[in-house]
Amino acid sequence: LLFLLVFFIPFTGMKGLPAMGEMKGEFHVYPAILMVFLGVLYTILKLPKLNRSFLLMLIPFAVVVLGIFANYSNIISQPEFKYSDGLSRLFSQSTVLVFYLLVTYSLLVVFKKDSVETIVNVCISAIFSSFYVLSAYCIFEIPYVIGFDFTNPLLDMYSNVFRAEEYREYLRRLRGLSFEAPSLANYLSIVVVATIYRARHSGKKYWLLYLWIAVLISLSYSRTAILTIIIITLAYALFYGLTKSIKTRAFYFLISIFLFISIVLLDLSSGGNGTEYLISKIKSISIDTTDDYHLASNLGRWGSQYAAVAIGLDNWIFGVGIGQSGFYLPSYYPDWAFGSFQVRNWSNSLDPLWPPIFSIYTRIFSELGSIGLALFMTFNVVLILKLKSIITQSKNVQDKYLAVLLLSLMVLSLILFAQFGSFRLLIYWISIFLAMKLISEQRMRNE
């Protein structure tokens, strides 16, 4: 069941049960429901002792409850917008958060007697298995991306059966089994971390795999994916260096190979000037870009961030309540943001698309206030510091390597959260589950 949960991470934008709301298109949700059922069953039968870190994790959730009470009168009187009222948005978004908290709790309960190393091996195997399936699909999608249409019937066949929206990426960007190209790129960042972890044992075999991942990311044309991969690769090398392992020099050589592959690929994909290409990509996220292709998206993304921060500043203690930011965003968008058709659609009550916030941090600030954001960040920082302590102080070499992996996944998750405004980022919840379990194992050994 855990294998399936991780295996289905890249399967997004799929046909699903309407009752699941925004989660219906995420295939991992369905094995996750079974996992929650098992967690409840284990709780009834065995009454397990709660993990201390999980109890700490419930403190930010308490702020959600306080925010509901603090804003309840505004929530119930919220006029209908885009066919939703305050209570329906409160229920749907609270359900998403509670669901992933229950998934994390269930993982802790169901796998209480299993070692972190065993669980990690299952997760890594699932990541590579789904990646191989994804790669097979991408082989048929790449001809379309580079301008050929002879594989379109096969792509359409898959879309007609599985995808919620039957269309091909009209900009000819690789999206694989995901809803859109950025989602694919985010998943491939996870595969990069798994690849580096496995490369400790058989590095040569994984150089080609890393190259293939880099090719797929370049064909997704994601503006942040290549930069994310470079950052997370360097972060992994930094964390690995903290282990003071005798193999550190060899591993740094391997990291150098990985980065060299990334830079060469970047250079080739940009006509021979990778540095200039990377700088242009960084500049392309600005609202002052001359790139019309990116401008509408940038105005929408930065406009929503600006509006979310403004909402948070006006409601800085508890925010406006979970799920409520969309009602306020149209009044807070800056004038320059309306240059984007996306913002105009988000502000139109007749358009069904709910106004998004493209970062969990600004969303938490607007909906849960400064207290909610501070507690969320504190929880993550505490876990990160405890993992760092394992890396530098544990006498168990394998625990050090596991801590490096989990610390890298947590950092990656927090980077992805900077451009993802929903709590349904499964890799984050799996990372903190494994981190809490490893910390608990270390505590038990030291007692």
Regions found by a protein language model. Give the residues of each.
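Long extracytoplasmic/lumenal interhelical loops at the membrane interface
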Residues: 168, 290-306, 310, 314, ...
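Juxtamembrane membrane-water interface segments that cap and precede transmembrane helices
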Residues: 12-20, 80-83, 160-177, 303, ...
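Loop-to-helix entry and N-terminal half of a specific, functionally important transmembrane alpha helix
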Residues: 2-6, 205-213, 351-359, 366, ...
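N-terminal hydrophobic segments of proteins, predominantly signal-anchor/transmembrane helices
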Residues: 2-17, 32-102, 410
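Membrane-interface helix-loop-helix junctions at transmembrane boundaries of multi-pass membrane enzymes
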Residues: 1, 40-58, 197-208, 244-250, ...
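A membrane-periplasm/extracellular boundary helix in multi-pass inner-membrane enzymes
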Residues: 142-146, 240-291, 310-313
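Alpha-helical transmembrane segments of multi-pass inner-membrane proteins
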Residues: 101-106, 121-158, 166-170, 175-242, ...
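Helix-loop-helix junctions and helix-breaking kinks within/between transmembrane helices
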Residues: 15-27, 67-70, 74, 92-95, ...
